[in-house]
């Protein structure tokens, strides 16, 4: 009897896991973590704060359409060339699949959104790059869309504002992507020769071929705080010159101190600053 008792109690017990159907789950996208200080915030409140962290003031990437909404008069934006998409001119393996994946993820056709809008009643041409799409890299379509809106602004005598956010030229398009550096610069030269205003607004990050072309040749060059701006990477430069670079090298504040920017503007002051600049440089209409 006692032998049977101890034998039964020594047998391994089996447990059954019961799923809790009432388990509370946080809906996807309701919270956002700051990439710098790691603070978790309500996404809705963060969006209302223009994606600026409440804790550390870090300027989190702002999607193209959100930025356009933040700087324009309500319902004044008219988009150009919305359906234009990249082909695969070099038959680069996997390139088309990556483009389609980014299109689904971002609801964008390419890495830049262009069009016309008004700010305090002043009409202007605008292009806004979005680093979520192929890291904002500049390929044939990005260059073409930017050139088209610049040429439209030149023809209709409009000021032009461009927000850059890019990792540089798109490697999958090779020399075709590099050609966009010269192509966009030529369109900007015609715009400048017409006596029209070009405001370049550099956001994080603006690097490579974009920083070496249209992003750096504005009549007025602005940037957001702490934005990374440069051509080659920090490590590449240090290895090339065999010197240690300053800690704040390639930041917006460093460029401002060395005369390469006109002003570093907090995102909450972005709309007001642009409105003032557009009004100050507004073309005076001559009497007939």
Curated annotation (Swiss-Prot):
Belongs to the AccD/PCCB family. The gene is accD. It is found in: Cytoplasm. Pathway: Lipid metabolism; malonyl-CoA biosynthesis; malonyl-CoA from acetyl-CoA: step 1/1. This is Acetyl-coenzyme A carboxylase carboxyl transferase subunit beta. A zinc finger (C4-type) spans 34-56. Its cofactor is Zn(2+). GO terms for cellular component: acetyl-CoA carboxylase complex. It comes from the Bacteria. It comes from Staphylococcus haemolyticus (strain JCSC1435). GO terms for biological process: fatty acid biosynthetic process; malonyl-CoA biosynthetic process.
């Amino acid at each position: 009897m006692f032998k049977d008792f101890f034998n039964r109690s020594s047998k391994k017990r089996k447990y059954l896991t019961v799923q809790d159907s009432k388990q509370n789950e946080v809906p996807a996208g309701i919270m956002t973590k700051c990439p710098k200080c790691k603070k978790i915030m309500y996404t809705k409140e963060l969006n209302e704060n223009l994606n600026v962290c409440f804790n550390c003031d870090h300027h989190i990437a702002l999607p193209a359409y959100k930025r356009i909404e933040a700087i324009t008069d309500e319902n004044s934006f008219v988009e150009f060339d919305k359906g234009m998409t990249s082909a695969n001119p070099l038959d680069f393996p996997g390139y088309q699949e990556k483009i389609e994946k980014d299109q689904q993820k971002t609801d964008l056709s390419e890495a830049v959104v262009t069009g016309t809008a008004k700010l305090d009643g002043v009409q202007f041409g605008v292009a806004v790059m979005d680093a979520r799409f192929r890291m904002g890299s500049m390929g044939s379509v990005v260059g073409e869309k930017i050139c088209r809106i610049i040429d439209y602004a030149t023809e209709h005598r409009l000021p032009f504002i461009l927000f850059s956010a890019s990792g540089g030229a798109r490697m999958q398009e090779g020399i075709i992507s590099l050609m966009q550096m010269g192509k966009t610069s030529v369109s900007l030269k015609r715009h400048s020769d017409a006596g029209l205003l070009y405001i370049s607004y550099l956001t994080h990050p603006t690097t490579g071929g974009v920083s070496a072309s249209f992003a750096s040749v504005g009549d007025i060059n602005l940037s957001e705080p702490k934005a990374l701006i440069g051509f080659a990477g920090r490590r590449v430069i240090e290895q090339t010159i065999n010197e240690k670079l300053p800690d704040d090298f390639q930041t917006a504040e460093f460029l401002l101190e060395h005369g390469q920017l006109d002003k570093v503007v907090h995102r909450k002051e972005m709309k007001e600053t642009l409105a003032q600049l557009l009004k100050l440089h507004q073309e005076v209409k001559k009497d007939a």
